[in-house]
């Protein structure tokens, strides 16, 4: 049996009079007084099928019994629709198929939600439980097709650039990379475990030691961490590594890769992409992931704050804190009620309050007006570039609190006041991150322990490790980190020194990294790499609300697969075979 001669988006007036066979799902069904209309849908489109009772009574009775989402294969003749009955919203909207034969291939139970009307809001958990039905609503499938095309563009481009695609192991060894590992027990080696890779980091570096020179892979990675809208326990990244290069060699390759990927969606990206150091990003935007679709740059107000008699300003200055803020063009129209809402908003991020200063033709209005002279306010307006009807919003707090609060506030205000176009794509490279950070009183890696320090900062490793900058870089798009990478350490002595600063004992280094240190000791080329978050890129490209919308079978916010009901308990016999006892 041949299931179709055409797809459901292909028939047009040029096919009128042809006998055709179509297969697909019943998208909509209508009985108009003896005339049954069926919208037959496949992945490619919809074709209207018609059956008239007065012409084919037995066939009409069968067709009249079908219901939504039944799978049919029909034969019939292509006809022109009656004048005035055309549907300009369909590629096949000028024709219909007069049915002559129907085969019911599969029936469907009553649906948990509507497939034909994708404007109806459906609870996300219900959508994930019935993901196969959710796919039929169209939007998910469209995004998966776009994802496929982006992946194909990536592979073709990387091949032209001389990169070799290599599949690295999924079962590996647990090594500290920042998040918790997913562990897989070994039946053959009781009490021992594999770890699913958080990234192919060590494997791709060892490929460089092995002389591959240029590697890439669209890799599946796993991290057991708390989830957010743009995080999943398993995710895909475009993983890249190259030998004998510097960031200045790598950046143009990645920039052109971005151009190729976005061209799939018909989006033009201008090159070269701008660059900004980590410190510049923090100073100007309060974050290392700045959204550059709008301005609202931060200004340091500490010198002006010294002229205030406002105790909160003076206390922060005395404690080594900061006073900074930004100017909102036209923001003097903000009501006191709205400013109170913003004040409560920044308190979520640790700020104690929000200072506002309006520049109006009638004069200055501010909640700190009595604490400084008009000359001080005018000097601030000049520094901020404020015009009449603008408002300054300031926060006095420790540096990290002020930055985080202002970062979120500027994003919120920019969105509320339509300061940018959603279809706008602003990239920026962020470079020269700190090599180390301090968490819970301990030094830890800002990226991962295989990142090389900047050459000029290596002497600081012994004296002041927290001031050492790394040869690392992130690519940020519209406030999202979509790629992260670094120059790698290719010297075993330097790698051991970094491990030592991270307070890894010689025993721990030997246990976890002996194979890697050994590899570095056999002649390792300088190398660097990057990983682009494919899920996050697709989220931005398609305008999806989160990465669950661009993944075929995603997990929930609690890392559960509602369709397969995973994770799930396993049989006692399986646990026994793996020498595992469950204690809770």
UniProtKB/Swiss-Prot annotation:
Transmembrane segments: none annotated. Keywords: Aminoacyl-tRNA synthetase, ATP-binding, Cytoplasm, Ligase, Nucleotide-binding, Protein biosynthesis. ATP binds at residues 223-225, 232, 481, 533-536. It is found in: Cytoplasm. GO terms for molecular function: aspartate-tRNA ligase activity; aspartate-tRNA(Asn) ligase activity; ATP binding; nucleic acid binding. The record marks 32, 84 as: Important for tRNA non-discrimination. It catalyses: tRNA(Asx) + L-aspartate + ATP = L-aspartyl-tRNA(Asx) + AMP + diphosphate. L-aspartate binds at residues 177, 223, 447, 488. Residues 201-204 are annotated as: Aspartate. Homodimer. Aspartyl-tRNA synthetase with relaxed tRNA specificity since it is able to aspartylate not only its cognate tRNA(Asp) but also tRNA(Asn). Reaction proceeds in two steps: L-aspartate is first activated by ATP to form Asp-AMP and then transferred to the acceptor end of tRNA(Asp/Asn). This is Aspartate--tRNA(Asp/Asn) ligase. The lineage of its organism: Bacteria, Pseudomonadati, Chlamydiota, Chlamydiia, Chlamydiales. The gene is aspS.
């Amino acid at each position: 049996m041949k299931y179709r001669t055409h797809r459901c988006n292909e028939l047009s007036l040029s096919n009128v009079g042809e006998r055709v066979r179509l297969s697909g799902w019943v998208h909509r069904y209508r009985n108009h007084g003896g005339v049954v209309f069926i919208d037959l849908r496949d992945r490619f489109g919809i074709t209207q099928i018609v059956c008239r009772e007065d012409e084919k009574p037995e066939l009409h009775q069968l067709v009249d019994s079908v219901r939504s989402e039944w799978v049919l294969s029909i034969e019939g003749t292509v006809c022109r629709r009656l004048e005035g009955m055309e549907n300009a919203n369909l590629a096949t909207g000028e024709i219909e198929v007069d049915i002559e034969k129907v085969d019911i291939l599969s029936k469907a139970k009553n649906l948990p939600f509507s497939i034909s009307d994708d404007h109806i809001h459906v609870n996300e958990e219900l959508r994930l439980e019935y993901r196969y039905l959710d796919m039929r609503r169209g939007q998910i499938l469209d995004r998966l097709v776009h994802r496929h095309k982006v992946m194909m563009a990536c592979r073709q481009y990387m091949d032209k650039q001389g990169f070799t695609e290599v599949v690295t192991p999924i079962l590996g060894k647990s090594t500290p990379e920042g998040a918790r590992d997913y562990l897989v027990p070994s039946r053959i080696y009781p009490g021992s475990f594999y770890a699913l890779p958080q990234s192919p980091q060590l494997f791709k570096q060892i490929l460089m030691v092995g002389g591959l020179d240029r590697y890439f892979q669209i890799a599946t990675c796993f991290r057991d961490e708390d989830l957010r809208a743009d995080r999943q326990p398993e995710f895909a990244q475009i993983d890249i590594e190259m030998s004998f290069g510097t960031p200045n060699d790598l950046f143009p390759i990645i920039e052109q890769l971005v151009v190729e990927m976005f061209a799939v969606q018909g989006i033009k990206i201008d090159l070269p992409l701008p660059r900004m150091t980590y410190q510049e990003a923090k100073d100007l935007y309060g974050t290392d992931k700045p959204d550059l679709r709008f301005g609202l740059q931060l200004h340091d107000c500490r010198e002006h704050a010294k002229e205030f008699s406002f105790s909160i300003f003076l206390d922060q200055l005395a404690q080594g804190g900061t006073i900074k803020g930004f100017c909102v063009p036209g923001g003097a129209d903000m009501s006191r009620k709205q400013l109170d809402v913003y004040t409560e908003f920044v308190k979520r991020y640790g700020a104690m309050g929000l200072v506002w200063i309006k520049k109006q033709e009638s004069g200055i209005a501010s909640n700190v007006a009595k604490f400084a002279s008009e000359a001080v306010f005018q000097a601030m307006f000049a520094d901020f570039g404020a015009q009449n009807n603008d408002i300054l919003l300031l926060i006095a707090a420790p540096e990290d609190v002020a930055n985080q609060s202002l970062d979120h506030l500027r994003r919120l205000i920019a969105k509320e006041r339509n300061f940018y176009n959603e279809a706008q794509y602003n990239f920026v490279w962020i470079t020269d991150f700190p090599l180390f950070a301090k968490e819970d009183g301990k030094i830890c890696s800002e990226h991962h322990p295989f990142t090389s320090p900047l050459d000029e900062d290596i002497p600081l490793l012994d004296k002041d490790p927290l001031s050492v900058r790394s040869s690392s870089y992130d690519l940020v798009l519209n406030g999202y980190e979509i790629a992260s990478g670094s120059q790698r350490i290719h010297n075993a002595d330097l790698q051991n020194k970094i491990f030592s600063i991270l307070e890894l004992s010689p025993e721990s280094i030997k246990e976890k990294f002996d194979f890697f240190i050994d590899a570095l000791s056999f002649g390792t080329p300088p190398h660097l790499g990057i990983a682009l978050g494919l899920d996050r890129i697709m989220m931005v490209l398609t305008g999806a609300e989160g990465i669950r919308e661009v993944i075929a079978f995603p997990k929930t916010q609690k890392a559960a697969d509602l369709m397969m009901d995973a994770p799930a308990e396993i049989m006692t016999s399986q646990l026994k075979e793996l020498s595992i006892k469950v204690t809770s």
